Amino acid sequence: MESNSNSNETMYGNPNINMGFVDSGNSNIGNNTGSMSPPPQQQQQPQQASSTPAGSVGIGGLSFSLGANGISLEPSSISHRVNAITSKIKEFKQERMETTRDWRSFVGSRQQYGLPNIKDTTSRIKENVVYFQSNYLILFLCFSVFFIITNPFYLLLLGVLLFISVYLHNSTTLTDIQRKIAYGIQAFLSIYFLLYAGSSIFWLVGATCCITLLHASFHSPNSTDETNIKFGDGV
């Protein structure tokens, strides 16, 4: 009995034995934690994140790349495209203005209006349409601007369609599937625009055609001889 009590006292009373037990446990825990490796999913996440190119944004399966191969949003690129668009508008305006007749001649006086003969109606309409074609086009554009201003939703749809067209034309990073999706969205918005704004478009085209036919029918035709036509007179 005395030997057993002495052995117990030496085991529980000796601090070196307890320290050795604790140290061995801590060393085992440290070795286990050091040898542990993260799950495979956690290791693959940085690789997936790094596979996305920098400077690109994905929306609905379409990647809007801002790099050199996509649409660049740098000030120099934007200014270049704006200058190209404005130059085309100026060229179109210059060409139309050169063929635009004097608006006083277009409106005319009472003496320039009269009922045409039935056999001369077709020739009169043809001559006036050829002579005043730029004036009729300007009237159509004025009606179109009024139509768009009074319907902001149509302006939004046209802006989205224009953005998709420009992006598809300039982007070189889209895959075939992404291009098909973009073309599908463009076709859907175009059909929706025609269905939603069908009555307004019919009114726009109908009003322009009625004014053109009435004016060309009752206005006395001017000479369409190239030697007597002076483009841009009075503009």
UniProtKB/Swiss-Prot annotation:
**What cellular component GO annotations does this protein have?**
Golgi apparatus; membrane
Q: Which Pfam families match?
A: PRA1
Query: Topology in the membrane?
Result: Multi-pass membrane protein
Protein keywords = Membrane, Transmembrane, Transmembrane helix
Which residue ranges have biased composition labelled Polar residues? 1-17
Q: Where is this region: Disordered?
A: 1-55
Instruction: Mark the transmembrane ranges.
Output: 144-164, 187-207
Where does the record place Low complexity bias? 24-48
Q: Where in the cell is it found?
A: Membrane
Sorted alphabetically, which InterPro entries does this protein's record hold?
A: Prenylated_rab_accept_PRA1
Transmembrane: present as a keyword of the record? yes
* Summary of the function given for this chain in its UniProt record: May act as a general Rab protein regulator.
Entry's family note: Belongs to the PRA1 family.
PANTHER family reported in the protein's UniProt record = PRENYLATED RAB ACCEPTOR 1-RELATED, PRENYLATED RAB ACCEPTOR PROTEIN 1
Protein name, please? Answer: PRA1 family protein 1
Question: What organism is recorded for this protein?
Answer: Dictyostelium discoideum
The encoding gene is prafA
